[in-house]
Design a protein with these regions (language model features):
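Catalytic active-site module of serine/aspartate enzymes centered on a nucleophile-bearing elbow/loop
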Residues: 128-161
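Acidic catalytic loop of the alpha/beta-hydrolase fold
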Residues: 106-110, 138-139
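Active-site nucleophile elbow and catalytic-triad environment of alpha/beta-hydrolase enzymes
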Residues: 26, 73-91
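Conserved hydrolase catalytic core segment
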Residues: 1-27
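Short alpha-helix in the alpha/beta-hydrolase fold that links the catalytic acid
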Residues: 88, 97, 111-120
Length: 161
C-alpha cells in the first residue's frame, strides 16, 4: 500500500508497480487515526511471526522455525499501525504506471472481490492479475515462490515488448 501511495504521488519515478498480499477493501474508509503519545511497542511473539504460514505442506517446519527465529531477532517489536486514514488516498484510477497484481489463492488478507474492483479501476491497460495456486500470504517463501518469480519476470518481459 505504501508502494501505491508513492506511485500515485511520484509516477515519473516509477516504471511499474507490483502489488502482493494487497489487503485493501473496496470502498472501505479508514476512520481518522491521530494517535497521541508513544506507540505501544508490543513485542513480536513467535506465534505472530509464524501467523502468515497457513497452508500445511507449502513450507517445511524447519523453514518456518528459522523464519520465526530470525524475525524475532531482527524485528522484536510488533508493527504499530498508525495514521491508517492516510490509506484513504489510495485509488486505482490514480495509478498511471503498469501494474502486476499478485494474489495468493488462500491469502486471508487479499480478497478476490476487492482485487477485481481494483483491477477494473486501473486506468493503464498494461496490467496483469495472477493468482498463485495453493499459496497464502507468505507465498514468496513457500512452494509457490517459483510461480511468483515466474509471474514477476514474465510481467517485466511483457512490458519490454
Amino acid at each position: 500500500m505504501i508502494g501505491q501511495l508513492v506511485t500515485q504521488q511520484y509516477p515519473q519515478h516509477i516504471a511499474s508497480l507490483t502489488l502482493f498480499g494487497y489487503p485493501l477493501k473496496h470502498n472501505f474508509v479508514y476512520p481518522e487515526d491521530l494517535p497521541t503519545g508513544q506507540p505501544p511497542r508490543k513485542p513480536t511473539t513467535a506465534k505472530a511471526a509464524a501467523s502468515d504460514f497457513l497452508l500445511p505442506g507449502t513450507i517445511s517446519q524447519k523453514a518456518i522455525d528459522e523464519y520465526v527465529r530470525h524475525s524475532l531477532r531482527a524485528d522484536p517489536i510488533r508493527m504499530d499501525w498508525r495514521y491508517t486514514h492516510e490509506y484513504n488516498q489510495l485509488a486505482a484510477a490514480n495509478i498511471s504506471v503498469p501494474v502486476l497484481l499478485l494474489q495468493a489463492e488462500f491469502d486471508p488478507l487479499a480478497k478476490t472481490a476487492s482485487h477485481a474492483q481494483l483491477f477494473t479501476n486501473l486506468q493503464n491497460a498494461h496490467k496483469q492479475w495472477v493468482v498463485l495456486k495453493n499459496a497464502d500470504h507468505a507465498a514468496l517463501l513457500e512452494s509457490a515462490r517459483g510461480r511468483l518469480i515466474s509471474a514477476s519476470t514474465a510481467f517485466y518481459d511483457w512490458l519490454q515488448r
